[in-house]
Amino acid sequence: MTIQEMHNEFRTFGQVMGLQLVRGILPESIDVYLNAAINETVRNIISKNVANSLQVGILPQAASITPINALRTLYRVHHTDITESYYFNDNPFELIVDFHNVLLYTDFYIDYKDGKKDVHCRLIEPDRLSDALTDYCTRPTINEPIVTMFTEVAENYLTVIKVMTGQIESDDKKVIDGIKICYIDNPKIVKYNVEGKNEGVDCDLPEYLHEEIVQLAVKKYIASISPTMSQQKN
């Protein structure tokens, strides 16, 4: 649906739910409830996909948000070529990224210069990193590297990605040639297009979710004005 169609659906469904007893709703107010419903829908989808994995601090590949599910229109892939030298556990590869609209990082892959591509990295929370590095079963290896992330205050609160491959100085050195970052964008903030202006912003979630979002927005609106509706009925 376009944003105009979502507004029309909001008013139609609202009348079915009893909103004809309430004075007219401004487009700006409908936008507020639509955006709240969009954000709640996205977070619920993410929660159902990764909640169990995040409880243990590790996000495995099987639990990641993929572009074939409900958030496929928000799925992004960014590839960065690496030209620096070798990296080891005591000097891991670090990359500062400037993605301001990221809702959730889902997957990381690295390429080696010898031709080995798309080696999946395990995402470890920073507070679990020390245990992962010293544990024989979870420590990083060339074929199962580890990625951790944190926000660097000195870098204007940009995200720092740290990659560890378990290599030591005596190893045959494998050079990291590139890194692929997969993430979910925040959804767009929808805005009604006032006649005569070209400021409308449509919902960028898949079409089949739009009706569910509108219905959730109406329910949120009714919940916010339910005392008023009760008074009018009396």
Explain the meaning of each model-derived region.
Residues 1-234:
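Glycine-enriched, solvent-exposed interface loops adjoining structured elements
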